[in-house]
Amino acid sequence: MNENLDPTTKGYNSEELDLEKRLRPLSFDDFAGQDQVLENLKVFVAAANQRGEALDHALFHGPPGLGKTTLANILANELEVGIKITSGPVLDKPGDLAGLLTNLDERDVLFIDEIHRLSPIVEEYLYSAMEDFKIDIMIESGPNARTVQINLNPFTLIGATTRSGLLTAPMRARFGISSRLQYYSTELLTTIVERSAGILKMPIDLEAAIEIAGRSRGTPRIANALLRRVRDFAQIKGNGTIDLEISKYALKALNVDAHGLDEMDNKILLTIINKFKGGPVGLSTLATAVSESSETIEEVYEPFLIQEGFIMRTPRGREVTEKAYKHLGKINTNIQGGLF
């Protein structure tokens, strides 16, 4: 996937990250989509505020770029508390987690992205913090070592994951709130594109906003990334306004087709068709064939390809669908051969 369109923020420079933050909604009122999730969260937050308690621990899961981090920040804003942000792979040992937990004020939010990647020892250390707001800390070492129990301020842990199936049952059970985020419709993404263009002070036509939204893989983060790149083309190759013509020109230059598939998406489909006769093919074999990691294919590319009906998962591996053949202008010889 084009680095600028990757539905993670990896590869973003400081300016891109600053723009990303500027475009993020800061309150429930600014957040578009995920209506049922949002309505439930409003109730939970209002109740917690009314009681003066910490919000129950919450888990957000779903494909990348749908608003998990944004919702964590919104919850902290709506609760009027502080938030500390970290990620599973960063927390190598219990001491890393203890440093964060002991510095949380009452009702603060601790957000752990990629929580499914916590090491088992750190995860187990988190259990007592989540349940009893207590942790054990080892004092000194050697024969003088002893354990001291420390009381924590009541806090809210918000976990985000793209792979909820990798969470252990004990961890999943400790979240009182669990919400799955869904892909966005073109209509909602159009609203998001128009809002973001307004923040960037960039004139945009409705037709252009619809075009960008339709190629954004149902993902707000990608919609905003595409908008920023189209803005560059409008500024240098156009008249400063994002219209339909410059949008199509820019999206073609970015190798983003009418379905929102980019170069790697189409490479995955073509590889399954040309090298594996349409499939089935195992994930690791496919990853080697397209020179991409299995994890990236499974987390970033595959969910949308399955959602849009280009790929099927079967017990024997991945297979492309008839829609993929038509999209790429290929003939499915497997079907033809079965007719004679």
From Swiss-Prot:
Catalytic activity, EC: 3.6.4.-
UniProt main location, coarse: cytoplasm
Catalytic activity: ATP + H2O = ADP + phosphate + H(+)
Residues annotated for ATP binding in this entry: L23, R24, G65, K68, T69, T70, E131, D132, F133, R174, Y184, R221
Annotated positions binding Mg(2+): T69
Spans annotated as Head domain (RuvB-H): 258-340
Cellular component GO terms held in the UniProt record: cytoplasm; Holliday junction resolvase complex
Signal peptide: none
Subcellular location as annotated: Cytoplasm
Pfam families assigned: AAA_lid_4 (PF17864), RuvB_C (PF05491), RuvB_N (PF05496)
Region (Small ATPAse domain (RuvB-S)) location: 185-255
Region described as Large ATPase domain (RuvB-L): spans on this chain: 1-184
Sections of the chain in a coiled coil: none
Recorded GO MF terms: ATP binding; ATP hydrolysis activity; four-way junction DNA binding; four-way junction helicase activity
The entry's keywords: ATP-binding, Cytoplasm, DNA damage, DNA recombination, DNA repair, DNA-binding, Hydrolase, Nucleotide-binding
Presence of keyword Hydrolase: yes
Top-level taxon: Bacteria
Purpose of the protein: The RuvA-RuvB-RuvC complex processes Holliday junction (HJ) DNA during genetic recombination and DNA repair, while the RuvA-RuvB complex plays an important role in the rescue of blocked DNA replication forks via replication fork reversal (RFR). RuvA specifically binds to HJ cruciform DNA, conferring on it an open structure. The RuvB hexamer acts as an ATP-dependent pump, pulling dsDNA into and through the RuvAB complex. RuvB forms 2 homohexamers on either side of HJ DNA bound by 1 or 2 RuvA tetramers; 4 subunits per hexamer contact DNA at a time.
Domain-level remarks: Has 3 domains, the large (RuvB-L) and small ATPase (RuvB-S) domains and the C-terminal head (RuvB-H) domain. The head domain binds DNA, while the ATPase domains jointly bind ATP, ADP or are empty depending on the state of the subunit in the translocation cycle. During a single DNA translocation step the structure of each domain remains the same, but their relative positions change.
Quaternary data: Homohexamer. Forms an RuvA(8)-RuvB(12)-Holliday junction (HJ) complex. HJ DNA is sandwiched between 2 RuvA tetramers; dsDNA enters through RuvA and exits via RuvB. An RuvB hexamer assembles on each DNA strand where it exits the tetramer. Each RuvB hexamer is contacted by two RuvA subunits (via domain III) on 2 adjacent RuvB subunits; this complex drives branch migration. In the full resolvosome a probable DNA-RuvA(4)-RuvB(12)-RuvC(2) complex forms which resolves the HJ.
Similarity section: Belongs to the RuvB family.
Protein name, as recorded: Holliday junction branch migration complex subunit RuvB
